[in-house]
A protein has these predicted regions:
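Cytoplasmic/organellar membrane-interface segments at the starts of transmembrane helices
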Residues: 264-266, 407-408, 456, 460, ...
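Short phosphate-coordinating micro-motif centered on Lys-Gly-acidic
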Residues: 145
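Hydrophobic alpha-helical membrane-insertion segments
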Residues: 42-55, 175-188, 269, 273-278, ...
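Membrane-interfacial helical/loop segments at transmembrane boundaries in membrane proteins
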Residues: 65-74, 197-224, 296-305, 513-544
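Hydrophobic alpha-helical transmembrane segments of polytopic
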Residues: 12-19, 36-50, 86-93, 117-124, ...
Length: 544
């Protein structure tokens, strides 16, 4: 990797972390609020540019990019390995964080502690990109902790509010238990497979090990199999998926989310619901499909391990179905606009889990496309709701009555996001739901399509309650002086609203050019993921 640009790609999370740590020091010297805000926006802009470069290189080169820290090759050193799957998700993270950073300037106007807000925001972005880019399961643990700790701090940003502190503590307690369980899974993985490198774990779980050999000093390097590995591998995967289901807020590990997300500032709620829960989704997908070859079960080295992976896929479908139905029902009885939207997140994570559990190309395409569509639409929904809350000073749906009449841009943005998430055409949410609907039928699970239809109907009714209240219901307060926000909040709304439409109308092209290649890299072309990691080792040691 001689291209300097590729080195910048590998250093993206460390660069963003450095920017985050430098901000409190800068704020000691520079007292200007606008400079601190500008620093936060520029920091997120740098991260977005680097994520765009990563996306471009992986799709242009069409093979994974491997970056070695300190020139230590895998499996000895920690590496970042970026294929089209995590590069695409990294692009979404970069864009949404940048828009949220701009939006936050006006939303938090007059609030103290803005330097800590942007420090934590940049830290969370660095952690999230680190989770996506890492090729090491222990480094994934570290980056999960970075992401989680910054999220706890941002949930507690309104530190004078009892609700925020209580929600942050609850979130931290549950998150700590989840990461501890994941650490136990890591101990099983390392004790059994003797490595923490994702590519080498993927190599050691496959029966096609003779295909993946690399000549190192005349000897072949390949996996050594013992029957105990099947039991250890299945146990490690089960523990890891349980931990990731907490991070993703998948039923029954969803209980922390409805308290944590509403308590945070609205731009942070957009990040938490739109992006942060997808960290768990990504980890589930990477473990299940890259490390344990769920889409190509015949590749697994042991029948018992295949059976365990199949059982876990069924569990994903069951839990996803329950998430969608339970969250859809709970949406309908909420009176707090942010709490209602938070339950919507649990419902959509359920859809994504169903797609992942199908282990078919179409199911995975539906899951990935819905992951992206939900990130965009949910960010828009929370940011639009945040404008209403910012103006009205309340999250009560009843007290927002009539505000939409004098805030047309905000209301239209909210409607676009709501209709997208409810699955109405021509918006992006409709397309990914239709893909999931078709995938269920192709898999012979047509009765489960009723879950999509019924839960979507619940969601549409819940969103209609908000739309009716803010647009058609008589105002309960004077609306004199109430209007749409300035460009700092309006531009992010407009961009996300346009994306909801474009991702819907241009879906055939996007699926063909972006989604399908990403799924191939994740689940069907794991040989390249393995080869690229070991090519680094071979080149350093004078290999092949």
């Amino acid at each position: 990797m001689n291209d300097p640009i590729l080195h910048l790609i590998g250093l993206t999370p460390p660069i963003v972390v450095a920017l985050a740590f430098a901000l409190p020091l800068l704020s000691l010297v520079v007292k200007s609020r606008s400079i601190v805000e500008g620093y936060g926006v520029v920091g997120s802009l740098i991260a977005m540019i680097l994520s765009v470069l990563t996306f471009y290189y992986t799709y242009f080169i069409k093979s994974p990019i491997v970056y070695t820290f300190g020139a230590w090759p895998p499996p000895i050193g920690i590496v970042y390995e970026v294929d089209r799957f995590n590069a695409l998700l990294g692009l979404v993270v970069g864009v949404v964080f940048f828009l949220v950073a701009i939006y936050s300037i006006e939303y938090l106007e007059g609030r103290e502690g803005i330097e800590w807000y942007y420090t934590l925001l940049l830290g969370m972005e660095a952690g999230m990109l680190g989770v996506l880019y890492t090729g090491d399961v222990f480094n994934l643990f570290v980056m999960l902790e970075v992401t989680s700790v910054t999220a706890y701090g941002l949930v507690a940003f309104y530190r004078s509010r009892k609700e925020s502190i209580e929600a942050a503590l609850k979130y931290a307690l549950v998150g700590s238990v989840a990461t501890t369980i994941y650490f136990i899974a890591l101990a099983l993985i390392y004790g059994s497979y003797g490595t923490l490198n994702m590519a080498q774990i993927a190599l050691k779980t496959t029966s096609s090990v003779d295909y993946f050999f690399f000549i190192l000093g005349g000897d072949k390097l390949w996996a050594v199999y013992t029957p105990a590995l099947a039991v250890a591998g299945a146990a490690a995967l089960a523990l890891a998926l349980w931990a990731f289901s907490v991070k993703a807020a998948l039923f029954p590990n969803h209980f922390w989310l409805p308290d944590a997300h509403p308590a945070a500032p609205s731009p942070i709620s957009a990040i938490l619901s739109g992006l942060l829960v997808k960290v768990g989704v990504y980890a589930i997908a990477r473990f299940t499909y890259t490390l344990f070859h769920a889409a190509q079960l015949s590749m697994l080295i042991d029948v018992a391990l295949r059976n365990a992976v199949e059982a876990l896929l069924i569990i994903l479908i069951v839990l996803g179905s329950l998430s969608a139905l339970v969250a859809g029902l709970l949406m309908m009885v909420q009176t707090d606009i942010k709490r209602l939207i938070a339950y919507s997140t649990i419902m959509h994570i359920g859809y994504i889990a169903i797609g992942l559990g199908l282990a078919t190309k179409l199911g995975l395409e539906a899951a990935l496309y819905h992951t992206i569509n939900h990130a965009v639409a949910k960010a828009l929904l929370f940011l639009a709701a945040g404008v209403f809350i910012h103006v009205a000073g309340t999250r009560s749906i009843d007290e927002l009555s009539g505000m939409g009449r004098v805030m047309p841009l905000t209301t239209i943005s909210f409607v676009i996001a709501a209709f997208s998430l409810a699955g109405l055409p021509p918006f992006n949410g409709f397309v990914s739901k239709y893909l999931l609907y078709t995938a269920l039928i192709d898999k012979g699970l047509a009765p489960l399509t009723l879950i999509i239809v019924i839960s979507s109907a619940f969601a549409l009714l819940a969103y209609s309650k908000i739309i009716y209240g803010v647009w058609l219901k008589a105002p309960t307060r004077s609306l004199e002086g109430v209007h749409d926000p300035t460009w700092k909040m309006s531009v992010p709304l407009l961009i996300l609203a346009i994306l909801c439409v474009v991702l819907g109308l241009a879906s055939p092209y996007i699926i063909e050019k972006l989604i399908t290649p990403a799924i191939i890299d994740l689940a069907y072309n794991t040989s390249d993921y393995i080869k690229e990691a070991f090519n680094i080792l071979a080149s350093i040691l004078g290999g092949r």
